[in-house]
């Protein structure tokens, strides 16, 4: 019976429409310019492994002034910054660009500016402070749970079926550059209403979509990860609905292992990498970003928020 069902699932899968969508690498513009303030540290958000915007060593007022003999000196979390470092660019006018940004580059950056507005005047001094944070996009996925009427819980048929179901679901969404992973599978004895005990398999899967950096182009909206993930959800839901329809039309006896109608659930889940979290109050200019956890906070797992930890003194802490 179980083998008959697997054959049916494979036939259904082969009939499923193939959906292909590949995305080209987006060109990143670094033309954004960030101006400092003497009143408060300006927050700057830099995507991991990308270059920062142009970070200026001037205020809005000085930006439109002529500065005589300006001297710029940048300091970062590790001390003095110099263009001798391959990941640091400092222009003659004091503009800072950080390339291939890493987690450990997050922190407080200061620029000391010495200048004159009139040649005969003494030097003026100004210190501008920035808080620069690494961030990444949320890693989101669907969590899929489903139940099957099963063979006796000690039967190897259940294990074989679980592997085959994973393979089938993975193949179903492969053309979307998505993948399915088994989180856990459990067999339980279930007491039926006004009936005896029956064995049921409880499956939990995750459905994720990969970043696609290919040369083939397609419409951006159709290649976005959320769009592909929703499409994968539609294909999986259609697959289980189709299985119920075919079983209801069949005159054959029920197989030993079969999907229990109505048990499929797919829940959208957001997550950040360990050491990162979403906080729209603390980071209103990057409200949906997974921003590196500041000192006095941490995120130990793939959660969604940084948690308070008064003993943590570093950026990106994963332990307290």
UniProtKB/Swiss-Prot annotation:
Glycosylation sites: 85, 158
Membrane topology: Peripheral membrane protein
Entry keywords, A to Z: Cytoplasmic vesicle, Glycoprotein, Membrane, Secreted
InterPro entries linked to this entry: Sp38-bd, ZPBP1/2_C, ZPBP1/2_N
Ranges in coiled-coil conformation: none
Pfam families: EGF_Sp38_C (PF20626), Sp38 (PF07354)
Principal location listed in the UniProt entry: cytoplasm
Gene Ontology cellular-component annotations: acrosomal membrane; acrosomal vesicle; extracellular region; zona pellucida receptor complex
Example GO BP: acrosome assembly
Localisation: Cytoplasmic vesicle, Secretory vesicle, Acrosome; Secreted; Cytoplasmic vesicle, Secretory vesicle, Acrosome membrane
Family listed: Belongs to the zona pellucida-binding protein Sp38 family.
Function: Plays a role in sperm morphogenesis and in sperm-oocyte interaction during fertilization.
Protein name in UniProt: Zona pellucida-binding protein 1
Organism field: Gallus gallus (Chicken)
